[in-house]
A protein has these predicted regions:
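Acidic, proline/glycine-rich low-complexity IDRs
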Residues: 1-104
Length: 104
């Protein structure tokens, strides 16, 4: 797994990256595992698995809960999936949005 292209080998590295985001040294943190990831920015928590994206609701998510989710993802124990209510993020192209707008 990686953060900013750096291989992550310990939970401490994840904690430090999240602390940097919480004090404004970075805008977001993405822990990626190939095509899948977990990410956070400004109290938002999202993950991607099997080509689908999800966000934790309701927002904002507390910093401690975000850290717990990142560590769970790193360990591969799946606990983060049970700790939140997840909503699928569905992306629409600009053309689809425009068509809907002009049908009204």
């Amino acid at each position: 797994m990686q953060i900013d292209g750096r291989e992550i080998t310990s939970e401490l590295e994840i904690i430090r990256a999240l602390q940097a985001e919480s004090i404004g040294k970075t805008e977001f943190v993405v822990l990626d595992n190939g095509d899948d990831f977990i990410q956070t920015a400004v109290g938002c928590l999202e993950y991607r698995a099997n080509g689908k994206n999800y966000k934790a609701i309701p927002e904002p998510i507390e910093k401690e809960k975000i850290q717990t989710a990142f560590l769970s993802y790193f360990r591969g124990d799946g606990q983060y999936l049970q700790d939140f209510t997840w909503e699928e993020i569905v992306y629409e192209s600009i053309w689809t949005k425009l068509k809907k707008l002009f049908k009204k």
